[in-house]
Amino acid sequence: MLVGLTGRNAAGKTTVLEWFQTRGFLTGSCSDSIRSWLSENDIQPTRENLISGGRELRKRHGPGILAEMLLEAFEGEDAVIDSIRTPDEVYALRKRNDFVLLEVTAD
């Protein structure tokens, strides 16, 4: 199963992610894809570089690339992806038949 988490800041996404993690799910976020690309290109993962790296990856490979990179990394494994931000990321993740998107909210 592939679970995507979305929601506002401080909504509890990390708590939900940790719950899945204790049950053996792998975890990741779209920013992990950017960090990986930065590392491969010997670029420091500063906030500024994460932002510009994400823009560059989307420009070169399309708006769903960050999610597509995670799909490749998780290849059929049970996993949870934190901080899904765009419809294009959801569309890319739906390529897996076992994908579900959860919106996390808290009062």
PLM ranges: what are they?
Residues R8, F20:
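P-loop (Walker A) phosphate-binding loop of NTP-binding proteins
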Residues K13:
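Conserved lysine of the Walker
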Residues V16-L17:
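Post-Walker A alpha-helix
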Residues F25-A79, I84-Y91:
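ATP-dependent small-molecule kinase phosphotransfer cores
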Residues D82-I84, L93-D107:
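Conserved phosphate-donor/acceptor-positioning beta-strand/loop module used by diverse small-molecule
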